[in-house]
Design a protein with these regions (language model features):
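Peripheral, non-catalytic segments that deliver or gate enzyme domains
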Residues: 1-226, 236-249
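A broad detector of the eukaryotic-type serine/threonine protein kinase catalytic domain
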Residues: 234-237, 256
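Single conserved hydrophobic/aromatic residue that forms the stacking wall/gate
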Residues: 250-259
Length: 259
């Protein structure tokens, strides 16, 4: 296949520097996937995925298999193992199966970290390279996690955590224990411990339970008479996840609570 026929082409090298992975597409969804053996002189570009009906990307090469994150036959995404000798979908084997919640994947410390979005909140599961579930990470609170990444030989990884009362803070993660420790945080003159966040569910008109995060100062009596800022968003398959805003914080002080 002539790669120049595609509108967008990108490439990356696996961490072990053995394979060049090439993604090609003509639109913003769905992609073709190819690879080239960098250890074999005059190696040809080989095909992994020969249609653009799904999104797929290689996250690693391990034990003569590509680990691929894909939404092929899995709307919420899964990880499959594809043998290098026969990497096309007919030979894919589920490595970490799809769940009811969407997933994003990070690597580091010779482990795989899968972030699931459950009711608009982050939960992170740790797996080994045999696909075995090890633990759910104990996060600093109800909020959003991003950027758990590192090299395979790293024993300490870093990630960012935030919610409506916690500005973006960097935590260090011990991959052997799954324990986190605050590394650094934004310098803002306020005390997060003065605020409370909790999740509730509101039944909409059609019976759907809609998750809501309520944030307010400690000590407020929740009697239904407090001024409240209510904000929501729904569209384009985008979920509104907790994030810190100094403007919302000041609004909370004035309005008593927001959700």
């Amino acid at each position: 296949r002539q790669l120049q026929k595609f509108r967008y082409v990108s490439g990356n090298v696996t961490e072990d520097e053995k394979y060049l992975i090439i993604s090609a597409t003509n639109s913003t969804t769905g992609n073709y996937l190819f690879f080239k053996d960098l250890e074999t002189m005059d190696a040809q570009i080989e095909t992994i995925l020969d249609d653009s009906s799904s999104d797929a990307y290689v996250i690693d090469h391990h034990d003569q298999n590509f680990l691929i994150v894909t939404d092929r036959n899995a709307p919420n995404t899964k990880i499959v193992s594809a043998p290098v000798k026969n990497p096309t979908p007919d030979y894919w084997i589920d490595f970490i199966s799809e769940k009811d919640s969407p997933m994003t994947v990070s690597l580091g410390g010779n482990y795989i970290f899968v972030e699931y979005m459950e009711h608009a909140l982050s939960t992170v599961s740790q797996f080994n390279y045999q696909g075995q579930f090890l633990r759910i990470l104990d996060l600093p609170g109800l909020g959003s996690v991003s950027s758990i990444n590192g090299k395979k030989d790293d024993q300490i990884l870093f990630y960012t955590f935030s919610n409506y009362s916690t500005p973006a803070s960097i935590y260090k993660l011990d991959v052997s224990t799954g324990q986190s420790e605050l590394h650094s945080q934004s310098l803002i003159e306020f005390d997060p411990s003065n605020y409370v966040s909790k999740q509730i569910f509101y039944k909409s008109k059609d019976g759907t339970k809609v998750p809501m995060i309520i944030t307010h100062k400690k000590g407020i009596v929740m009697d239904g008479d407090n001024p409240t800022l209510l904000y929501g968003y729904g569209g384009f398959d985008i979920s509104l996840t907790p994030s810190f805003s100094i403007c919302l914080l000041y609004t909370s002080d004035a309005a008593d609570e927001h959700s």
